[in-house]
Amino acid sequence: MDPLGPAKTQWSWRCCLTALLFQLLVAVCFFSYLRVSRDDPTVYPNGSPFPDSTGTPAHSIPLILLWTWPFNKPIALPRCSEMVPGTADCNITADRKVYPQADAVIVHHREVMYNPSAQLPRSPRRQGQRWIWFNLESPSHCWHLKAMDGYFNLTMSYRSDSDIFTPYGWLEPWSGQPAHPPLNLSAKTELVAWAVSNWRPNSARVRYYQSLQAHLKVDVYGRSHKPLPQGTMMETLSRYKFYLAFENSVHPDYITEKLWRNALEAWAVPVVLGPSRSNYERFLPPDAFIHVDDFQSPKDLAQYLQELDKDHARYLSYFRWRETLQPRSCSWALDFCKACWKLQEESRYQTRSIAAWFT
């Protein structure tokens, strides 16, 4: 009989027990890592953190965090029920301290596109928290779209196929008689204006303008042209019969404040360069604007504008739609409320590929 037998047996059991405890510890650490990774979009950037989640708000009144102000410009945030009576409310804040409790996070693309890995939220993501990708720029001016894939559950943009449609403007019927006075033609003392902040000589809109101004006088306002002091834009542009609502790039539904504010609020007929005429007609009557594509050349457009300048009846026909419709411009506060209402209407939790969609 081996005198060391009992000791060997005891030692073997201790080794086995130690090995089992070690394996158990490794398993606990591994599954803990998986749990944290599942909560953290920086670990699984290409998949839904919680694919089985319903996205149901954790609070009776949903809490929405504005991770970034659009263009770093804070605004007042009135209650949604004050903006549109009878609608639901949310608690909307830009205080990042509420991130762990937020039901939704709105991220405006421009403020995170330069370094997404550092500028997107990096803390673990609460289960069911929905991220909303908010964007006001065209794809031509959006960087690192691929880096957004796998993070966001809802899209919010000027594109009509967004989950949350936030156009730059729209038309809506008058609730009663039109509240505006008839157009005062005698106040229209100038012909064509264009206000442009980003002057790129090789851009399509600048090249078209240069060809047009060879046949027609165009007053250009902006950094490199005539000054347009703050607060005087509408007063200045309202003196013109036509306004060049030329977009900086051509993409579906990309119809910006150049039309909705600069032209329509100034009661100038918009001359548009952007998406197709049929795209514009999804949002405007066909006789509410003039499209550059309707003419074979800038020279032909110049001739047409000069004809309208002399023919008051034809010129006034571009305002006939105002008898039944009125233009409205967007506000970011209303956009945030649209997100609030969408979150309460729909509990679906999905993961969108931003890069594949936003082209």
From Swiss-Prot:
Q: Which reaction does it catalyse?
A: a beta-D-galactosyl-(1->4)-N-acetyl-beta-D-glucosaminyl derivative + GDP-beta-L-fucose = a beta-D-galactosyl-(1->4)-[alpha-L-fucosyl-(1->3)]-N-acetyl-beta-D-glucosaminyl derivative + GDP + H(+); an N-acetyl-alpha-neuraminyl-(2->3)-beta-D-galactosyl-(1->4)-N-acetyl-beta-D-glucosaminyl derivative + GDP-beta-L-fucose = an alpha-Neu5Ac-(2->3)-beta-D-Gal-(1->4)-[alpha-L-Fuc-(1->3)]-beta-D-GlcNAc derivative + GDP + H(+); an alpha-Neu5Ac-(2->3)-beta-D-Gal-(1->4)-beta-D-GlcNAc-(1->3)-beta-D-Gal-(1->4)-[alpha-L-Fuc-(1->3)]-beta-D-GlcNAc derivative + GDP-beta-L-fucose = an alpha-Neu5Ac-(2->3)-beta-D-Gal-(1->4)-[alpha-L-Fuc-(1->3)]-beta-D-GlcNAc-(1->3)-beta-D-Gal-(1->4)-[alpha-L-Fuc-(1->3)]-beta-D-GlcNAc derivative + GDP + H(+); a neolactoside nLc6Cer + GDP-beta-L-fucose = beta-D-Gal-(1->4)-[alpha-L-Fuc-(1->3)]-beta-D-GlcNAc-(1->3)-beta-D-Gal-(1->4)-beta-D-GlcNAc-(1->3)-beta-D-Gal-(1->4)-beta-D-Glc-(1<->1')-Cer + GDP + H(+)
Q: What InterPro entries does the entry give?
A: Glyco_tran_10_C, Glyco_tran_10_N, Glyco_trans_10, GT10-like_C_sf
Q: What is its EC number?
A: 2.4.1.152
Q: Where is this region: determines site-specific fucosylation?
A: 73-112
Q: Which UniProt keywords apply?
A: Glycoprotein, Glycosyltransferase, Golgi apparatus, Lipid metabolism, Membrane, Secreted, Signal-anchor, Transferase, Transmembrane, Transmembrane helix
Give the free-text PTM comment from the record: N-glycosylated.
- Enzyme class (EC, first level): transferase
Provide the Gene Ontology terms for cellular component.
Answer: extracellular region; Golgi apparatus; Golgi cisterna membrane
Question: Cytoplasmic topology: which positions?
Answer: 1-14
User: Topology relative to the membrane, per the entry?
Assistant: Single-pass type II membrane protein
Function of the molecule: Catalyzes the transfer of L-fucose, from a guanosine diphosphate-beta-L-fucose, to the N-acetyl glucosamine (GlcNAc) of a distal alpha2,3 sialylated lactosamine unit of a glycoprotein- or glycolipid-linked sialopolylactosamines chain or of a distal or internal lactosamine unit of a neutral glycoprotein- or glycolipid-linked polylactosamines chain through an alpha-1,3 glycosidic linkage and participates in surface expression of the sialyl Lewis X (sLe(x)), Lewis X (Le(x)) and non sialylated VIM2 determinants.
Protein's name according to its UniProt entry: 4-galactosyl-N-acetylglucosaminide 3-alpha-L-fucosyltransferase FUT6
